[in-house]
């Protein structure tokens, strides 16, 4: 089947996860949402200097999280700043959501969402060429807002329900396996016939055509200065502001893709944000039982 080289506008749900009265958000069993998170990470400022500090950013983490700070609700701004928490390996249960894309640890990863249909047919998202650019974001107030920029590097690993454990074990962390791969292949809606692609994101130190993956962020020193709306990206040749779900793929040659990437960088920076290039992976931490659905009798557990 034909490979895809170019830019993908990828729409995923943009709503913010709620936080319970005790400050916790349980592992998600419902629709994917975003979280406004604080972790130790790395970012590049406008002068191209790399900083290591606490950062705040919008992203996906469907595992448990703990509130760090809260604000009065305002349109498009986050209501809660949360810290992602890794409780250790999950237990198999229907509906357990996976984290995809994944921006924590040594590499960004993307491996499931919209790559296949329930009947086993795969989409063009399994056939991305190295150097392709994925702009993950959401449609809010009739505009496309960005949370993750993913530059596909040349380490692409195909996998399916029969092969994933062997094919991917050497290339992913235990945390990624637990919060993304295990829930993915526990999901009965993921076809046995479909072969997915595990993509890794090009990093600052291993750029692809001078491009690297990043997420818009700010340093977190003062809660009132770290809060931000997701940046609007307006590039008519590749962005459709009317797109409410799904993806738009625009085939481009590598030089054109790089030009789009540069425009995205400029627009993110012009909205007062920095380029987050790394987020420390959450280490195993104790959590209350009520944030783990398999300890609450929710859904249906089954043997692996």
Give residue spans per PLM region.
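Short N-terminal edge-element motif at the start of the domain
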Residues: 72-143
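Contiguous surface segments at macromolecular interaction interfaces
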Residues: 1-76, 158-304
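Short beta-strand-centered aromatic/proline hotspots
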Residues: 145-157
């Amino acid at each position: 089947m034909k490979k895809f080289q170019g830019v993908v506008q990828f729409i995923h749900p943009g709503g913010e996860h709620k936080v319970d009265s005790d400050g916790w958000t349980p592992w998600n069993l419902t629709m994917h949402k975003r979280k406004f998170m604080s972790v130790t990470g790395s970012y590049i400022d406008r002068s191209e200097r790399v900083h290591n500090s606490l950062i705040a950013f919008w992203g996906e983490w469907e595992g448990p999280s703990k509130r760090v700070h809260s604000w009065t609700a305002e349109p498009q701004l986050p209501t809660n700043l949360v810290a992602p928490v890794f409780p250790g390996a999950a237990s198999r249960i229907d509906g357990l959501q996976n984290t995809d894309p994944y921006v924590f640890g040594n590499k960004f990863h993307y491996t499931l969402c919209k790559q296949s249909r329930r009947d086993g047919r795969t989409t063009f998202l399994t056939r991305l060429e190295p150097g392709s650019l994925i702009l993950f974001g959401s449609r809010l107030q009739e505009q496309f807002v960005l949370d993750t920029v993913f530059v596909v590097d040349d380490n692409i690993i195909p996998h399916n329900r029969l092969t994933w454990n062997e094919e991917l074990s050497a290339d992913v962390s235990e945390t990624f396996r637990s919060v993304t791969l295990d829930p993915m292949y526990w999901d009965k809606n993921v076809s046995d016939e479909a072969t997915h692609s595990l993509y890794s994101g090009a990093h600052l130190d291993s750029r692809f055509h001078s491009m690297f993956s990043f997420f818009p962020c700010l340093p977190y020193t003062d809660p009132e200065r770290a809060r931000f709306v997701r940046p609007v990206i307006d590039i008519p040749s590749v962005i459709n502001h009317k797109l409410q779900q799904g993806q738009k793929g625009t085939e481009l040659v590598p030089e054109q893709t790089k030009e789009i990437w540069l425009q995205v960088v400029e627009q993110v920076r012009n909205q007062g944000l920095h380029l987050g290039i790394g987020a420390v992976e959450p280490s195993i931490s104790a959590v209350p039982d009520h944030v783990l659905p398999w300890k609450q009798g929710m859904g249906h557990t089954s043997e692996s």
